[in-house]
C-alpha cells in the first residue's frame, strides 16, 4: 500500500493508502472525509459470528509499517478464520490527528457500508493531557453512539507510553479503561503489552528512534493483541511473523494473548 504525506504523528498532512486500483467507493469515501486516509482490503464478506469487517480509525500509530490493519488481516488469514475473499478491513487516519478531528468523516465512512467493528485510536497524548482529554471523551461518546446506531461495535485502541516515560502506561490504561467502562465498549490493551515487552525484552525495540512511533515489532505486537482481543483466541503459533523471525514472533504472540487475558480478568 502506497502512502502519501508526512511520517509523523505530529504532522497535519493527510495520507491516502490503497491496495490495487481505487474503486469508486473508495474515491467517494476519500472525498467525503476530506483528507482522512482510507486503505482497502478484500470486498466480498460472508456473514458470521466473528467480526470480518473492521474499520481502524486513528493516526500514524495505526498506519506506520504499512499499516496495522494489514498485519492484523494477515494474522486472521494465517489462522484460517478468514480468507482474503471473506474479510475486509480499512484504515481512516489523519497524520497527527486527535480523535475529535475525525468528526467530519466518521459518520460518512461508517454509513457507506456495514462494519462489524470500528476501532478508535486517540492521539498518543489526547486522552491524558489537559485540554484534550475531555474532547477525546466527548468524541468517543459520540462516535460510539453513531456506531451502535448503525449496528457496529465500538472498540478502543489503548496506545503505549513513549520511551523514557513509563508513567504514561498507567495514565493511558486508566483513561481508556474508564471510557470503555462508561460506554460498555471493549478496550484492546496494546499499551500494556508494550509495557511488558519493554520490561522483559529490551532487545526487541517496539518504537523507532523518535521514541513514540511503532517499529515493525511494535506494529506486529499491536496486531497480535487485536487478534487475541477481537477473536478471544491465542495468536500463538500462527505462521505469519512479519519477517521478524519465528522466535521473536512467538514471544510477541504470547505476550499479546497473556495481556488480553490479564486485562479481561481485572
What is each residue range found by the language model?
Residues 38, 213, 223-266:
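Conserved catalytic region of serine esterases and O-acyltransferases that act on ester linkages
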Residues 48-52:
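A short, charged/proline- and glycine-enriched loop
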Residues 33-47:
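Bacterial Sec-dependent signal peptides at the C-terminal "C-region" and cleavage site
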Residues 4-24:
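Bacterial N-terminal signal peptides that target proteins for export
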Residues 23-34:
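Bacterial N-terminal signal peptides
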Residues 53-57, 62-137:
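Conserved SGNH/GDSL esterase-like catalytic core that processes O-acyl groups on lipids
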Residues 107-220, 224, 228, 235-237:
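Alpha-helical cap/lid subdomain in secreted, periplasmic
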Amino acid at each position: 500500500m502506497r502512502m502519501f504525506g508526512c511520517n509523523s504523528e505530529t504532522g497535519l498532512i493527510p495520507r491516502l493508502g490503497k491496495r490495487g486500483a481505487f474503486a469508486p467507493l473508495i474515491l467517494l469515501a476519500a472525498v467525503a472525509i476530506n483528507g482522512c486516509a482510507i486503505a482497502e482490503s478484500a470486498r466480498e464478506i460472508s456473514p458470521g459470528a466473528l467480526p470480518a469487517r473492521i474499520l481502524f480509525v486513528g493516526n500514524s500509530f495505526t498506519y506506520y509499517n504499512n499499516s496495522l490493519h494489514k498485519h492484523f488481516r494477515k494474522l486472521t488469514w494465517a489462522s484460517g478464520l478468514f480468507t482474503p475473499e471473506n474479510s475486509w478491513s480499512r484504515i481512516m487516519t489523519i497524520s497527527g490527528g486527535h480523535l475529535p478531528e475525525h468528526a467530519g468523516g466518521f459518520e460518512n465512512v461508517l454509513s457507506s457500508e456495514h462494519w462489524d467493528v470500528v476501532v478508535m485510536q486517540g492521539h498518543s497524548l489526547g486522552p491524558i493531557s489537559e485540554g484534550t482529554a475531555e474532547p477525546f471523551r466527548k468524541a468517543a461518546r459520540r462516535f460510539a453512539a453513531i456506531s451502535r446506531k448503525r449496528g457496529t461495535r465500538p472498540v478502543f485502541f489503548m496506545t503505549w507510553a513513549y520511551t523514557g516515560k513509563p508513567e504514561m502506561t498507567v495514565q493511558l490504561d486508566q483513561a481508556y479503561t474508564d471510557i470503555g467502562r462508561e460506554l460498555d465498549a471493549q478496550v484492546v490493551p496494546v499499551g500494556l503489552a508494550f509495557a511488558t515487552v519493554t520490561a522483559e525484552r529490551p532487545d526487541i525495540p517496539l518504537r523507532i528512534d523518535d521514541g513514540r512511533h511503532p517499529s515493525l515489532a511494535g506494529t506486529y505486537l499491536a496486531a497480535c493483541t487485536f487478534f487475541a482481543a477481537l477473536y478471544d483466541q491465542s495468536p500463538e503459533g500462527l505462521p505469519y511473523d512479519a519477517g521478524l523471525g519465528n522466535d521473536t514472533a512467538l514471544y510477541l504472540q504470547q505476550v499479546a494473548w497473556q495481556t488480553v487475558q490479564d486485562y479481561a480478568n481485572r
